Amino acid sequence: APAAMSCLGTDADPTYVPYLRQKLVEVIVKAESRLQAAEVGYSSIDASHYTAVRRWVRRPDRMAQDPFGNITVRANMHAGANWDDVTGESGPEDPTLGVLAVRSTKGEPLALLTNFSMHYFSGEAAISSDYFGRYCEILEEKIAGDDAPEFVAMMSHGCSGDIWRKDYTQATPSEIQQLD
């Protein structure tokens, strides 16, 4: 999406801001018109087999150069084959896959919000809905199908700056599990 606000050296897109504002008003009005009594449930599972820590602490004598040319980098992503440079993982992962489900008082699915702490990964694609989008598409197909076209699946991005899908502690990376 274009920039909605000026940030990090990028100016807000002057045509996108009013468009976005109008679309936000439309979805708020639509949501308000559909308000109804509902039931909420939640759960969580350990999904550690889908994620691993991707940042590694470097040895004090093997610190790396920062973008300004100073030797200050004590942790780096993707240790890969540089095992002699690191002392270990930079911290624990959050393996929890949390789920919040909303259904009508008649038991019809309305929405599902999932939270997962894993960094996005789009592969070679420059623009992608990534696993967030594919995950939601699959949930919408499997939970609601054509019977509940208003059902919405969402996935929020948990605390995941250091977490990725590949486990570098494994000598041979395990096959990446596909969502399909």
Give the positions of each predicted feature.
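Conserved beta-alpha junction segments in alpha/beta enzyme cores
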Residues: 1-151, 156-159, 163-179
